């Protein structure tokens, strides 16, 4: 089974872009096209279907089975809704985007790969890059999704990108939906299990969930690695020269 799944090393790239990053995604995409090794297509998932960036296929987020309105209805109209929405867009991209390959690399729209970087090993495993973050509410949330999901690795799965395999994402969704007696779809359970007291801070992480699931159930399909990276305020020489990639979040830009 493993050899069958890993026989095809092609993959696509998915970038979810929100209003905060409309002014930076064109530049980050230049670095993606230059330094991500081996991709086929780049899909840009956006609330603005008219956004047009060279080398990318724009996907209207309206084709997904949920919307920002679902979050507004549940949590009220607030600035964090978009942050949780993009997490769900990442999970569902492999199920919704027409013609997307089974494997896809998620890259945050404010993340810049500075050096040529591989994402699949020679024997077909997915590289997953680790970070150092630890935020307890992430693990409390995933454990509410399913009792088996708990911190399994000393490092974090958060590094502003991740490599998803649709067959494994489906497995994760089925695990959670079955646990909740198939009464609701995964995306609704994901939202329901966010602690309201943590919502406005950071109450869930798609990257930690997927990293934990793969490390627990399919460790032979991933290769955990460390790259040099950091969060920066600008794309300056102080960051560029010492890192493999950087992220420049909207709230810290100079």
Positions of the model-derived regions?
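Active-site-proximal specificity loops/subdomain of glycosyltransferases
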Residues: 53-96
């Amino acid at each position: 089974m493993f050899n069958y799944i890993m026989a095809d090393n092609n993959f696509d790239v998915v970038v979810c872009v929100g209003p905060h990053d409309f002014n930076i995604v064109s530049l980050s995409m230049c670095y993606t096209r230059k330094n991500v090794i081996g991709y086929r297509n780049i899909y840009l998932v956006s609330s603005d279907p008219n956004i047009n960036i060279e080398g990318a296929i724009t996907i209207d987020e309206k084709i997904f089975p949920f919307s920002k309105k679902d979050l507004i209805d549940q949590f009220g109209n607030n600035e964090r809704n978009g942050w949780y929405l993009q997490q769900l867009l990442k999970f569902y991209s492999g199920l919704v985007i027409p013609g997307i390959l089974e494997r896809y690399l998620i890259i945050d729209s404010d993340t810049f790969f500075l050096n040529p970087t591989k994402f699949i090993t020679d024997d077909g495993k997915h590289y997953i890059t680790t970070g150092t973050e630890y935020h307890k509410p992430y693990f409390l949330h995933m454990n509410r999704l399913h009792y088996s999901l708990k911190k399994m690795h000393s490092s974090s799965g958060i590094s502003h990108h991740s490599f998803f395999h649709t067959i494994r994402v489906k497995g994760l969704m089925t695990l959670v939906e079955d646990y909740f007696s198939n009464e609701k779809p995964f995306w609704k359970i994901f939202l329901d299990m966010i602690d309201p007291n943590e919502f406005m801070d950071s109450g869930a992480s798609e990257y930690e969930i997927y990293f934990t699931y793969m490390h627990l159930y399919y460790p032979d399909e991933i290769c955990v690695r460390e790259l040099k990276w950091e969060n920066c305020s600008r794309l300056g020489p102080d960051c560029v020269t010492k890192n493999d990639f950087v992220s420049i979040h909207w709230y810290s830009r100079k």
